[in-house]
From Swiss-Prot:
HAMAP family: SlyX. This is Protein SlyX homolog. Transmembrane segments: none annotated. PANTHER family: PROTEIN SLYX. The gene is slyX. Pfam families: SlyX.
């Protein structure tokens, strides 16, 4: 393999690697946006759960149900 063939091969590999890096970067950006949306949803759900938490708690002072 002469020098020109080696250079051509390296240029081809470099172009392929550049394309792969760009594709991976696009995927990473998409996943990061999805993670950020999920974090916002989780925060909203936790806040909602805290707000609703007092509605379903039973008091220890309540009398037992009639079938006791």
């Amino acid at each position: 393999m002469d020098l020109q063939d080696r250079v051509t091969d390296l240029e081809s590999r470099l172009a392929f690697q550049d394309d792969t890096i760009e594709t991976l970067n696009d995927i990473l950006v998409t996943q990061q946006r999805a993670v950020e949306r999920l974090q916002l949803q989780m925060t909203a759900l936790l806040k909602r759960q805290e707000e609703m938490g007092g509605q379903f708690e039973t008091s220890e002072e309540e009398a037992p149900p009639p079938h006791y």
